[in-house]
């Protein structure tokens, strides 16, 4: 995507190739720049993807600094302040618009074309963000993102007025996914853009479960929907404690409430979803090792054990069953669609 912003550092900042500070989260294959003054150090990491432009700024500040920022067009941003001794503040020069970037609170922004100032307080700070393709929020998928409608429309219409969403929590699951994305970027492989898009969609999906909006969706339905998303993304690596952490409820509470409504535990539902995921994956792969990796298992042995425990079949028999069913896991015994 096109980078739509730039900034001008004060004259005392010099570009350096051997900075005195080390990055907390290096991004694989990113474009990296460092600047230093007598008192401060700033690092930029960026990666230009097809569906999103990734940026990362780390600040080591002995003195507060204000940096002018210029945007050449209105764009939709997703931001994650991963570290901050005190909030960073960005404001428009002429509009009544300001946003504070506080540790652990993410936000979506529409930054209109114009001039801004970013005030960076004394201390250590990390700000990560993505410039997003607003086309990701097309109907019907956008029905889950009502809190973004005004920003998506502002982007499409190139509104002259900047705006922001409510903030959302940035917890351990989000941080782990960001670090995973940082480690996997590789423009030299064919499916790099697919990987980036998959990771970005997961982060976007995850953000909506952190926002307490209209309360129309019951907690257990939120838990089931989040589990479905995480199984597709992480497979067997999904921990129910992560679901509980995102929704700020105990694992035992979610398990019991699920059992009351659906007559099976949340853990049972997790296994049903995972088996369904395996059933739809295994027929397309020649090697079980590929299926194990794509479905989040640490080894073929672990995949074999799971299939055997859930169906009584060997992986080979299970795969044959899916192929005989015309690649339709809904009609295969032992891989039935989880109850909705």
Predicted segments, located by residue:
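Short Lys/Arg-enriched alpha/beta "domain-start" segment
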Residues: 1-34
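N-terminal regulatory/effector-sensing and dimerization cores
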Residues: 32-151
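Amphipathic alpha-helical segments enriched in hydrophobic/aromatic residues interleaved with Lys/Arg
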Residues: 146-198
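Linker/hinge segments immediately adjacent to helix-turn-helix/homeobox DNA-binding domains
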Residues: 151-162, 196-213, 241, 246, ...
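Basic, amphipathic alpha-helical hairpins
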Residues: 179-192, 201-213, 223-238, 257-258, ...
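Terminal helix-turn-helix DNA-binding modules in bacterial transcription factors
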Residues: 229, 260-301, 320-340
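Append "Primarily bacterial transcriptional regulators
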Residues: 241-250, 254, 258, 291-298, ...
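Short coil/turn motifs that cap or connect alpha-helices
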Residues: 250, 265, 298, 313-316
